[in-house]
Amino acid sequence: MINELSILIPVYNDSAVALVSVLHSQAEAIDGLEYEILAIDDGSTNEAVIAENRAIDGLSHCRYVIDRHHDCRAAMRNNMTSKGKYEWHLMVDARLSLVYDDFLLRYLSSGAQRGEAVCGGVCVDGGADSARLYKENLRFRYEKFEEKNHSVEVRNRLPYNSFRTTNFFYHRSVLERVPYDERIKGYGYEDVMLGRAFRNNGIVVRHIDNPVAYTCFEGNAAYLKKIEEAMLTLHQFAGELKDYSPLLGMVGRLRSMHMLWLVRLFHRLFSG
């Protein structure tokens, strides 16, 4: 079993205290594990959240680091890997929650090799508010629709297309050799581009059952803004992502059937 670990948590206007506390408890319970937990803040603007996250410094082997010097999410995540002092890294997003009490053990005992990335996956948990969220929240409804694609069996059928950076375990040499693509300045598709780069460079992507849960969902206006930004990124890199995006696949099929004019007409009629 692997006995050293740098846990890297990107933070932006989210409290990471709950996640760090649970990860810290799990790490402390593993005999012989050398570890650190770094919550790295990429320029949060919410002062209340920043103040709350400073409590992380009170836990052993844990640090809250404010680092405002990145021009994109990809650069921030590449820099996170350089800050981790151990050979094995786990990257997990701040606003997610753990599902299993042996989350860390599942990764450390997964048989991970130096030349591969191991993905635990994601799930959706709206708790007692699930029915209301399904009616009112677009992000929750989308994630519930996609939930059927989150099983280990489905993800391993197309391991590179299913790669997500919200929750993955890797040897530091993986991202040193094949880093995030810093050409992506806007929101979205960093993980898709990284999965594509892994495939092109012989990095194995393996999926296991070790999900983190979405339990917080942004409002509809914020979510639609993210979608708009992601569509701009997709358009910019369409040539490279054509085999990795279902949306681009649909556009290709419409083009082959000479039906794109219908989509353009619909957009003119209903976009105001």
Residue ranges and their predicted role:
Residues D14-E28:
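Short, well-formed alpha-helical segments that are part of the catalytic scaffolds
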Residues D67-G84:
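Glycine-rich, basic loop-to-helix element that forms the pyrophosphate-binding segment
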Residues H89:
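Short aromatic/hydrophobic "clamp" motif used to bind/position activated sugar donors
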Residues D102-Y134:
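Conserved donor NDP-sugar-binding/catalytic core segment of glycosyltransferases
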Residues L138-Y160:
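Short, flexible, basic/aromatic active-site loop/helix in glycosyltransferases
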Residues G186-L194:
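Acidic donor-binding loop at a coil-to-helix junction in glycosyltransferase catalytic cores
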Residues K226-Q236, E240-G272:
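Non-catalytic, C-terminal membrane-associated alpha-helical segments of glycosyltransferases
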